[in-house]
Amino acid sequence: MQSVSQVVKTSLPNYLSSLPVPDTFGGWFKLSFKDWLALIPPTAVVVGIGYVTYRAFYPKAHRTCKSGSGLCNENVRKHEAKVVDMIDIENIADKAAFCRCWKTKNWPYCDGSHAAHNKDTGDNVGPIVIKKK
């Protein structure tokens, strides 16, 4: 414990006070190459702590697919500006499941592709099921 106390009370303050931090903004332009090299280690430590903190508190809701594109629709009718399907309810036999994850190969009907999508992204999307009464 004494070694930790020595580092915190003596070594670290001595190291920080010996760093060539200028008093004015213009002083940054007068630093030599050796002074800039001396500032790299503490800057790297501060950046590393900032990055680790950012990753620790980064919301899990912002995860994207393995492809990393962030798009919902990656392959269904990309030549159209907006994908819209009109389905007459009278044409549905008993019930129909419609895709909401855009991963199906049988568009607009669900083929269960959302299971892999949910596993990859942590999402919980499922189909829209329409039944006849």
UniProtKB/Swiss-Prot annotation:
TM ranges: 36-58
Segments in the Cytoplasmic topological domain: 59-133
GO biological process, one term: regulation of autophagy
Keyword Endoplasmic reticulum applies: yes
Binding residues annotated for [2Fe-2S] cluster, in chain numbering: 99, 101, 110, 114
Residue numbers on the Lumenal membrane side: 1-35
GO cellular component: endoplasmic reticulum membrane; mitochondrial outer membrane
The family this protein is said to belong to: Belongs to the CISD protein family. CISD2 subfamily.
Protein name: CDGSH iron-sulfur domain-containing protein 2 homolog
Organism of provenance: Drosophila virilis
